[in-house]
């Protein structure tokens, strides 16, 4: 079975959960994909979240270049968020000939076209299904399954965090602050929820 070593960059709420899944379900994912997936690096400046989750400290790496220089790393998962640092990380990974997976819709909204072209010119892929709909496979359906259709409208929940908060406020009479705190406790909102609750995430 062919193998793919993964460098996960950014170990916050989403990154930590992703690392846990990659470690916990390694055999299951390898069987389902036909590819031996291995989490090789967790790259971040601060490993407080990673340590709190009990992740393997042997995987911790502060220097992205170390991960990119590893010839066994074929996939970089970008979970830093924002656009500036995330763009730099993504470009560096693509230049190094690594496939990139990102859930960063802000990055894609601002630089998606350029990054996709950059990936193609380096013979690799940038995958971003996780950036929309909580990973529901809608992007591939639109790109592949509906390629011959004229899509005139899409309806759905624009932001899961806001949807949760508003549902709690309407159905349970929760105060905004309490609903937000509960969302954060349940991993449905980042420690800094500004991007979600300001409407910027929805705009992206």
Q: Which functions belong to the PLM regions below?
A:
Residues 1-95:
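N-terminal glycine-/serine-/threonine-rich beta1-alpha1-beta2 phosphate-ribose binding loop
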Residues 11, 15-18, 35, 83-86, ...:
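Generic structural signal for well-ordered, non-membrane alpha-helical segments
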Residues 19-20, 52-55, 112-115, 137-144, ...:
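Short acidic, glycine/serine/threonine-rich loops at helix termini
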Residues 22-26, 119, 146:
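Active-site catalytic pocket residues across diverse enzymes, especially alpha/beta-hydrolases
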Residues 79, 103-106:
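Catalytic beta/alpha-barrel core
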Residues 86-96, 105-143:
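Rossmann-fold NAD(P)-binding glycine/threonine-rich loop
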Residues 120, 125-204:
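Core active-site phosphate/anionic-ligand binding loop and the adjoining beta-turn-alpha structural block
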């Amino acid at each position: 079975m062919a193998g793919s070593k993964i460098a996960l960059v950014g170990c916050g709420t989403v990154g930590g959960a992703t690392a846990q899944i990659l470690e916990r379900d390694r055999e299951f994912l390898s069987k389902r994909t036909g590819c031996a997936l291995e989490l090789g690096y967790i790259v971040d400046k601060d490993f407080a979240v990673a340590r709190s989750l009990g992740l393997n400290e042997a995987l911790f790496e502060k220097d992205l270049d170390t991960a990119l220089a590893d010839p066994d790393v074929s996939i970089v998962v970008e979970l830093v968020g924002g656009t500036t640092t995330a763009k730099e990380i993504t470009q560096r990974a693509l230049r190094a000939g690594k496939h990139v997976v990102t859930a960063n819709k802000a990055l894609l909204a601002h630089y998606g076209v350029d990054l996709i072209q950059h990936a193609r010119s380096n013979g690799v892929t940038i995958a971003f299904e996780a950036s929309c709909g909580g990973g529901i496979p809608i992007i591939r359906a639109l790109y592949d399954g509906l390629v011959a259709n004229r899509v005139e409208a899409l309806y759905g929940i624009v932001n899961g965090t806001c949807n949760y908060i508003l549902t709690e406020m309407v159905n349970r009479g929760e105060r905004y602050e309490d609903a937000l705190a509960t969302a954060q406790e349940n991993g449905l909102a980042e420690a800094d929820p500004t991007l979600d609750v300001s409407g910027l995430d929805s705009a992206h």
